[in-house]
């Protein structure tokens, strides 16, 4: 069965909830350019934990 047939709720939006250090680990700079080393950025953030 598909999700809608089972009665799952609509997707949740997180408006206004932003981590304190989200700008430091963002994929884009304020001027719109992409950061060069995304793997290092992910390792430095607290969202990715290696075992």
UniProtKB/Swiss-Prot annotation:
Listed GO CC annotations: endospore-forming forespore
InterPro entries documented for this protein: SASP_SspK (IPR012611)
Induction text: Expressed only in the forespore compartment of sporulating cells.
Region of interest called Disordered, as start-end residue ranges on this chain: 1-51
Superkingdom classification of source: Bacteria
GO biological process, one term: asexual sporulation
Protein localization: Spore core
Compositionally skewed regions (Basic and acidic residues) per UniProt: 21-43
Keywords: Sporulation
Principal location: other
Pfam (any one): SspK
Classification via NCBIfam families: SASP_sspK
Family indicated by similarity: Belongs to the SspK family.
Classification via HAMAP family: SspK
The protein's name: Small, acid-soluble spore protein K
Species of origin: Shouchella clausii (strain KSM-K16) (Alkalihalobacillus clausii)
